[in-house]
Amino acid sequence: MFRAAAPGQLRRAASLLRFQSTLVIAEHANDSLAPITLNTITAAGRLGGEVSCLVAGTKCDKVVQDLCKVAGVAKVLVAQHDAYKGLLPEELTPLILETQKQFSYTHICAGASAFGKNLLPRVAAKLNVAPVSDIIEIKSPDTFVRTIYAGNALCTVKCDEKVKVFSVRGTSFEAAAASGGSASSEKAPSSSSAGISEWLDQKLTKSDRPELTGAKVVVSGGRGLKSGENFKLLYDLADQLHAAVGASRAAVDAGFVPNDMQVGQTGKIVAPELYIAVGISGAIQHLAGMKDSKTIVAINKDPEAPIFQVADYGIVADLFKVVPEMTEILKKK
């Protein structure tokens, strides 16, 4: 289990660094590596010791080659089988357990994405350990920092488990360099198929806009837009900025946009170079998902809106006038 750590305990563990070894579970789409995996590798490197990556899937040779070049990775373990199609946690867990049994890793981690949040609790349960979720900082090999109360407080936890299983908030760690490494690759330990689930199909929505969690610019709308049709104002602005479009929980709950656009504690965590909040009041739940953005611009007609407390630039005005004006100015450039 884990408990709150006393300040004096944070100084220990320097002598343990040489004994650390970490397994990063790579998230990928067979031909491309998920960006959050690079952030997770950086976090794993903070623990000291050797960092290995496990790649499971089908026809994922390109991902293996890319990971071998990533700085900080010592070894890439590869498991290619039809059972790993779709990266189902029911199938990946036995593989991870066999890998852990053979190599005795002290830490197992993945990005705190839907993939990692779905997989790691199952792995931890099978190992009979308590996982630590969504960490934002590593104090020492057994001490981690995560947010609580919708990001309003930080909790430092000391994990005494024999194997530390944790997920990493990608926005809190820089991405590892995609070149400069020279890791070796080898076949991962074999494991039997669980046989309790089967991957059938996946249909991805195609968009010319960047993916929300990886975009450098994000334009988000809230309940102030009043309808889903009015989100076209944001789409037009986003097209000029080559930006992704997000939304507050209030906008999603109102049915303006689908829930995969939600930014916030119960949605997606983003940290773009530029975040433009349009018609968003700034509820705690939303701020928890975007407050790490490099530059925040808020547009709201209410000067007392909480969003202005975290914004670098604020525009107190009617969004239905300001947003079209911004779009027209950008079109002329």
Swiss-Prot record:
InterPro entries in the cross-refs: DHS-like_NAD/FAD-binding_dom, ETF_a/b_N, ETF_a/FixB, ETF_alpha_N, ETF_asu_C, ETF_asu_C_CS, Rossmann-like_a/b/a_fold
Modified residues (Phosphothreonine): 93
Domain of life: Eukaryota
Cofactor(s) listed in the protein's UniProt record: FAD
Cited CDD domains: ETF_alpha (cd01715)
Single GO molecular function: electron transfer activity
Residues bearing PTM N6-acetyllysine: 59, 62, 69, 75, 85, 101, 139, 158, 164, 203, 226, 232
Residue numbers bearing the Phosphoserine modification: 140
Residues bound to FAD: 223, 248, 263-266, 281-286, 300, 318-319
Span list, region Domain II: 205-333
GO biological process: amino acid catabolic process; fatty acid beta-oxidation using acyl-CoA dehydrogenase; respiratory electron transport chain
Targeting signal (transit peptide) range: 1-19
N6-succinyllysine: residues bearing it: 59, 69, 85, 158, 187, 203, 216, 226, 232, 301
Segments for region (Domain I): 20-204
Chief site of localization: mitochondrion
Quaternary context: Heterodimer composed of ETFA and ETFB. Identified in a complex that contains ETFA, ETFB and ETFRF1. Interaction with ETFRF1 promotes dissociation of the bound FAD and loss of electron transfer activity. Interacts with TASOR.
Task performed by this protein: Heterodimeric electron transfer flavoprotein that accepts electrons from several mitochondrial dehydrogenases, including acyl-CoA dehydrogenases, glutaryl-CoA and sarcosine dehydrogenase. It transfers the electrons to the main mitochondrial respiratory chain via ETF-ubiquinone oxidoreductase (ETF dehydrogenase). Required for normal mitochondrial fatty acid oxidation and normal amino acid metabolism.
Domain comment in the entry: Domain I shares an identical polypeptide fold with the beta subunit ETFB though there is no sequence similarity.
Entry protein name: Electron transfer flavoprotein subunit alpha, mitochondrial
Gene name of this polypeptide: Etfa
